[in-house]
């Protein structure tokens, strides 16, 4: 006989346990290294022994601590500490000769733990939210802006309502309120908008200082191959170009003697490849792709009707509409804030207004009316993919202790996102120019887009690739589309490539390409890093061929002719730490105590069939709630793909 109990009643029986476990204790067994350059920076780290369990493969988790005043050399006042989390994984093969890769999710304000745990990291979390299994397609990653994920400025205790997303600070000495299934407490970064990155350019400065400390002073990294590659996703379409270009600008200043920083900031970072996965790169170029993806895509899904589609186009192109608003933003910013630092309130307001209008009138008719998923047009909402089991795992006491972290993990931080939005970071100019700058300086750019994503869709990615104005623009435009040969029987997508620039459309993949098509994503990543053509992995792309030309693909000029069938629907389940996976009725059942929950999963016929070992048998058991694993943010990773090392920088949880 199966017994049931309301969630609230179940949780009351473990209130004592919750009171002991809700706030992480002070980390123990942490190695502390003071900077040899006397800058006041520190590295603290542990060997966690989590996630990457391949014999002989080491991993390290910790923080780079930057003191107040670190960013003064860029003219930025910073009166708070920046504590950036990283998780470094050695390559599974030949780590001494492996290049290093940094992985970052976007947001802005989203944790890179999402990518690590559901896309390309060394492990996946099981449905019990307490154990992991190896990912055979790992890229072996980093976390960005301060206050994201496990990065922080200063710490404070908060309450959080998962349903309303209301977050309230607990003052010192204030009694700890009782928790239930949707009301949690935890320790997080300060949530002070003045102590995080205000825009992508600010974040680049903080990450560069992190890199100067880590690459020169972290004792676990001793490569013979000093190449560094950056892979990023979503808002990473801005992070990637801006961060990588900023790093290269600093490299050039160091080399030519125009950088006047202190001794510990003279390290040249040898940049090799920038990979952007379903990135929103340039708003002006990519906005036309939203009406097309909603109405005329390769899956034959008309997510909006002809009238709504026409309205989206009208909002984009009419006088005073989206396009005009972005052009106005850019003309003002180029004169009054050319570095995109958010220093001019008029520019900030105009650019923020442009983003708000374009989002509401050009993009959001799909999200409001279609009933389909924002990250996968092939799925109806709510969608449980990728599974959010990692959210609870990262706040398990044994995981927190192993990582040596003093706070609870959060998926995204609305304060960081608000700081970026407040200066109108989205529609500002410069992203495509950054990509052109990288290509002109010999740094490879690989654009990879799943063809079912709406959020940063492949039509917009293709337009961005064609909008890069550099020496070989015409040769890239002249290249045709070739199939991406993954093995003897499978074509994973289509690619246009000339030399160091490639644009790949990946079949049957949503926003998080490695989650949907892990082998295809890994092959593309591996080929890009090792100077092989994306189409076959057999041709060298680094050397000139006949008549001084680089390798280029040949085939049709357009990929739209390659059509797809809509996918079957995922079997739905609700994970209460990610309420976007739940229906309104399921959320109500949690609130009123009628839901039965095991391991943060609502028990119903679907979840019982999907996860019988977790929810399908035995008595319902109370689920101890972790300290608030939901929306705050994390930054960065370093991973390994057979031949690359990965650094996860939760630290671009850059607090600025």
From Swiss-Prot:
It comes from the Eukaryota. Substrate binds at residues 456, 512. The active site is at residues 234, 453, 511. Pfam families: Peptidase_S10. A lipid is attached at residue 627 (GPI-anchor amidated glycine). It is a lipid-anchor; GPI-anchor. Residues 1-21 form the signal peptide. GO terms for molecular function: serine-type carboxypeptidase activity. It catalyses: Preferential release of a C-terminal arginine or lysine residue. Residues 628-656 form a propeptide. It is an enzyme of class 3 (hydrolase). One of its GO terms (biological process) is proteolysis. Gene3D superfamilies: alpha/beta hydrolase. One of its GO terms (cellular component) is plasma membrane. Its EC number is 3.4.16.6. It is found in: Cell membrane. Disulfide bonds join 51-123, 322-358, 329-351. The keyword Magnesium does not apply. Glycans are attached at residues 130, 157, 180, 194, 256, 296, 305, 344, 408, 469, 487, 500, 592, 606. InterPro entries: AB_hydrolase_fold, Peptidase_S10, Ser_caboxypep_ser_AS. Keywords: Carboxypeptidase, Cell membrane, Disulfide bond, Glycoprotein, GPI-anchor, Hydrolase, Lipoprotein, Membrane, Protease, Signal, Virulence. Belongs to the peptidase S10 family. Extracellular serine carboxypeptidase that contributes to pathogenicity. This is Carboxypeptidase S1 homolog B. It comes from Arthroderma benhamiae (strain ATCC MYA-4681 / CBS 112371) (Trichophyton mentagrophytes). The lineage of its organism: Eukaryota, Fungi, Dikarya, Ascomycota, Pezizomycotina. The gene is SCPB.
